[in-house]
């Protein structure tokens, strides 16, 4: 006897925007209240200061600073949003997601979203935020990607390798 499959409704939204603009801002406006609650749930003092976030970006990913600054501006120059958008010192969250790579003449990358569906943004983004290469992927945290592929065909998938 087999177990019946559970079907969960899922709605995906997609946007295409070469640089952050009104479509990203609409995503921000729709999701920021929930992200703000999550980001500040342990108190704002438990999150890094804005200067620390900026220094971390400058040290680790300086090429992202112009995009981050544009996103911050679109977020109304809200310092709390700027801190969260830096993705530095985020609150702890469960890690997961399964993936499989099938090598061969036509390699295949398969990725599963193993989190609670309520945590899934359900957004597919097509962007060129770097100004160097178009990217299509599953968006998370407003401007990060869980997985995706660039215009040259390089596919990537986020995994934590079994480590929290």
For each feature predicted by the language model, list its residue ranges.
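N-terminal mature-domain region immediately after signal-peptide cleavage
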Residues: 1-164
